[in-house]
Amino acid sequence: MNATRKQRLWLVIGVLAAAALAVTLIVFALQRNMSYLFTPSQVRAGEAAGYQQFRLGGMVKAGSIQRAGDSLKVSFIVIDKNAATQVEYTGILPDLFRDNQSVIANGRMQGGRFVANEVLAKHDETYMPKELKDAMAQGHLGKPVPATVAPLTAPR
């Protein structure tokens, strides 16, 4: 093997090693930032037990919203057809947050309750994220969830 071929071989090996290192770092970064969505039924079944941080999706139970008088702390219950999970959140809730509305809370389980660091409310009366609709449909024993299609309109 002459010197030019040897130099090219080391260059190719170096480029491949750098690419492998970059891919490995990207995969680890994406895994740390992934947030899985679970319904209250899945949480109760223990499917979320291995996740430190995850999203909880469902409906806000009517009459369950309790606000602390001296702080921004709010407590409410997220339900699906088969289970309920107590949620605590400290912060300003979205304007569309209310009873019987679809909600997604990002946070972690702590002492049997879900402590949220972010709460998202659905943005209109017909929208439900596909992953939440699919997850809730699995919890509806024998009852299909109706399609939720909202017409797209261009901003004016």
Swiss-Prot record:
It is found in: Cell inner membrane. Heme binds at residues 123, 127. Signal peptide: none annotated. Keywords: Cell inner membrane, Cell membrane, Cytochrome c-type biogenesis, Heme, Iron, Membrane, Metal-binding, Signal-anchor, Transmembrane, Transmembrane helix. One of its GO terms (cellular component) is plasma membrane. Residues 30-156 are periplasmic. The chain crosses the membrane at residues 9-29. Heme chaperone required for the biogenesis of c-type cytochromes. Transiently binds heme delivered by CcmC and transfers the heme to apo-cytochromes in a process facilitated by CcmF and CcmH. This is Cytochrome c-type biogenesis protein CcmE 1. It comes from Xanthomonas axonopodis pv. citri (strain 306). The gene is ccmE1.
